[in-house]
Amino acid sequence: ASGEGGWGGNGDDMAKGINEKGASGEAAERPPVYAALDFETADYQPDSACAVGLAKVSEGRIVDTLYSLIRPPRHRVLFTWVHGITWKDVCDSPTFGEFWPQMAAFLGDVTHLVAHNAPFDRRVLEACCQAYGLPHPQWPFICTLRASRKQLKLPSHKLDAVCRHYGIPLDHHHAGSDALAAAQLLIHLQRQAREAGKDVTP
């Protein structure tokens, strides 16, 4: 990925450490800005996003959030039992392509995307962008699941378990709540890494 994230570039590697100080060059002179991202999907296809949540982190604080239901490309919602979202809930919602301008504006100053189990959310983001003819996203990703496994000795490192460990409120499988929780988890892990003098690579 390019040093500043965003669109374009020719890299595709999963991102740097959770104690990341920023990209090389000019970007290194400004603090990184993170956006925790969470998708819920309607079916087994990664382009079936039916909800998205984002929470922006700058200098150790959550500074903004964004949430929307999304109308998926197919009417059959298979995972209502997971997230509670039905076709009736999303049939009048914007498609990913229609929502994208608002999401892109939110991500305008973001240098890194963050997710708990980042490969899943990255795959959904890439598939949705491809489905609507949008440029391939090139933000480096930080995976708080991988980071928590390295940093915390817990029986489980699922999002709800790690949130219980830190006392982070969570309405699990609500994309807005999951994104906000991942952002708070990032802040906790960064603080803990700094105190230990470590650079935790997700």
Predicted feature locations:
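Generic alpha-helical structural context detector
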Residues: 146-149, 164, 184-187
